[in-house]
A protein has these predicted regions:
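Conserved phosphate/anionic-ligand binding catalytic regions in large, soluble enzymes, centered on
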Residues: 37-56, 146-149, 236-244, 308, ...
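Short glycine-rich or small-residue beta-strand-to-loop segments that form or flank ligand, phosphate
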Residues: 50-51, 80-86, 110, 231-234, ...
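Glycine-rich phosphate/diphosphate-binding loops that line cofactor/substrate pockets in enzymes
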Residues: 65-81, 221-228, 295
């Protein structure tokens, strides 16, 4: 990974986004559905792109919105639709476009009061609360967000009635319908003028902020945080929760300071990320330089990304915690301090999250539920109240209410961040100190990731590998215990391969946007063993790709 010389430094003026030009491109540029990259494509968290690249333009939003209206009608979803936005420049225009289509279809849309920005967890919370106890007239939602992506990006995320990110069956349906509309030059898309849509009897206002904030004590022990008198620093990174934090401080009498309350679609206040781009990633030490500088001024400092579904934790003892480390600490704390949680509640993790989570879960006597990358895989289990905590290595997590009922079914950066304050208050030590104690008992993992070139054909082979195509008996001097291409928790394809030994593992997956594959690795045997795992992993994967290519050639003759 080549680190930019700008990484960790304030963004130079020449790097800042030309917002008027981006908005003009959103309306003026027309995507070509014959160009693969310009089609609608739902990844692990919705459709994302930039208006400059003709990958996120008004035509995309019109087509996706029409497709969602048809999906709702086909699947008898006729309750309100909760519609939120983050602070990216394209989010408000996309919201306006979507409303024109939704209102034309007579969908009851719940916009935020005062056109407030709306964190993803506030939308998920609204859907879950509305649908509780209902079997008909169910609500769903849309959030306009590209998550922590650079300022020029836009994103469109659909949350069905379970309140979480849509699964592949849903997104495939919407994607196919939307692309058909693009191919037909939007013929069949219903829309009405924006002012008419705002005045429509089906357009309503919803107080997302207070509905969410007033319910927070049901998921985090904020009374303990207040009683401990902790000093908490918060950097919203210019994101959708910027006005939520002062309300949280006031409502729960917490000594909480927002270190930067600026909202600016150029995100000029950010320090540059590792690759020389502006990115609002709370798990990146380069993007988090400002808050890391406040480490000794607060008992705990926290941040969230642009739609506030991801978290970053800065401790006096450890600085910025790696996301895997904090997930393990959160699980260790929650399952010991939630007496109303049922004994059969499981822990959810993705296949590339740390095996320390497995060890903590085993120590607690809980069941592990391991799924492919993507938080959407947890939504149904959270909705049914079967998963107590769910986390992914990219700093996303949520968990049940203190009474064991569903809180959100999508990632919640606010709750995860406040949990760090609860841990500090109730354990008498910050999450970094808890992690140090945990690893003294269970072992300290070393984590890493490398990338290797892969052609589109090789990426396709990697995503469809079978365990039998992966050859080898040992990895870094240890016997291989398992080779999987499907997740143990739900038997869904992981889109690659994971190989595990007693003290280490690697997982290889193709990139969705570049001609590379990524190898994630971990070792409880130290950095040297991790380096061996990553090196041998590339050899194993390259051999499997060659075998897969040979098999493909044989079958095509």
């Amino acid at each position: 990974m080549n680190i930019s010389p700008l990484a960790g430094h304030p963004a130079p003026a020449g790097m800042l986004l030309d917002v008027p030009a981006l908005i003009a491109a959103y309306y003026d540029e027309v995507p070509d559905p014959a160009a693969r990259l310009e089609r609608v494509s739902f990844g692990t968290s919705g459709h994302r792109g930039s208006a400059f690249d003709r990958t996120f333009n008004e035509h995309h939003v019109l087509a996706i919105s029409e497709a969602i209206c048809r999906y709702r009608r086909t699947h008898s979803i006729d309750g309100p639709l909760f519609l939120g936005i983050d602070t990216h420049a394209l989010s408000a225009p996309a919201c306006a476009t979507a409303l024109e289509v939704l209102a034309a279809h007579g969908v009851n849309v719940m916009l935020a009061e005062h056109d407030e920005y709306t964190p993803t967890p506030a939308v998920s919370h609204a859907i879950v609360c509305y649908n509780r106890g209902r079997i008909t007239g169910l609500a769903d939602g849309i959030v306009m967000t590209p998550s922590h992506n650079p300022p020029a990006d836009g994103g469109f995320k659909y949350n069905p009635p379970n309140g979480g990110g849509a699964d592949t069956a849903v997104t495939s349906w919407i994607e196919a319908s939307a692309n058909e509309l693009l191919e037909r030059k939007l013929q069949g898309v219903q829309r009405i003028p924006h002012e008419q849509a705002l005045r429509a009897p089906t357009t309503h206002r919803h107080d997302y902020l207070n509905a969410y904030v007033d319910d927070l004590a049901s998921v985090v022990d904020l009374e303990a945080v207040s009683a401990a008198g902790l000093r908490i620093g918060v950097d919203p990174l210019g994101g959708a929760g910027v006005h939520y934090w002062p309300r949280i401080a006031e409502r729960y009498r917490i000594d909480l300071t927002v270190v930067n309350d600026a909202v600016d679609p150029t995100f000029r206040f950010m320090t540059v990320d590792w690759d020389g781009r502006i990115r609002m990633d709370p798990s990146s030490r380069y993007a988090m330089q400002r808050l890391i500088g406040f480490k000794d001024d607060f008992d705990i400092a926290v941040a969230c990304d642009t739609d506030h579904d991801r978290h970053g934790i800065v401790c006096r003892s450890a600085g910025l915690m790696p996301s895997n480390d904090y997930l393990a600490v959160s699980i260790h704390h929650l399952f010991r301090h939630r007496p109303e949680w049922r004994a059969e509640l499981a822990v959810g993790k993705t296949v590339v999250s740390s095996a320390l989570i497995d060890r903590v879960t085993g120590k607690l006597g809980r069941r592990l539920y391991e799924v492919p990358v993507g938080f959407k895989w947890f939504a149904d289990g959270l909705a049914r109240g079967e998963l107590g905590f769910c986390g992914e290595e990219s700093a996303g997590a949520t968990f049940l209410r203190r009474n064991g009922e569903t809180w959100t079914t999508d990632k919640d950066g606010i709750a995860a961040a406040l949990l760090a304050a609860e841990i500090t208050a109730r354990e008498g030590r910050d999450p970094g100190e808890v992690y140090a104690a945990l690893t003294r008992e269970l072992g300290r993992p070393a984590n890493g990731r490398v990338e290797a070139h892969a052609s589109p054909a090789q990426k396709k082979i990697l995503s469809a590998l079978s365990p039998e195509q992966v050859k080898g008996d040992s990895l870094a001097g240890e016997k291989i215990q398992s080779i999987i291409t499907r997740a143990p928790g739900n038997d869904a394809p992981i889109g690659g391969v994971k190989v595990s030994t007693e003290t280490g593992w690697f997982a290889a997956r193709p990139s969705g946007t570049e001609d590379i594959y990524k190898i994630y690795g971990e070792s409880f045997g130290g950095r040297e063993q991790l380096d061996r795992i990553l090196a041998e992993a590339q050899t194993i994967v390259d051999a499997a790709l060659a075998l897969g290519a040979h098999a493909h050639e044989g079958s095509s003759r």
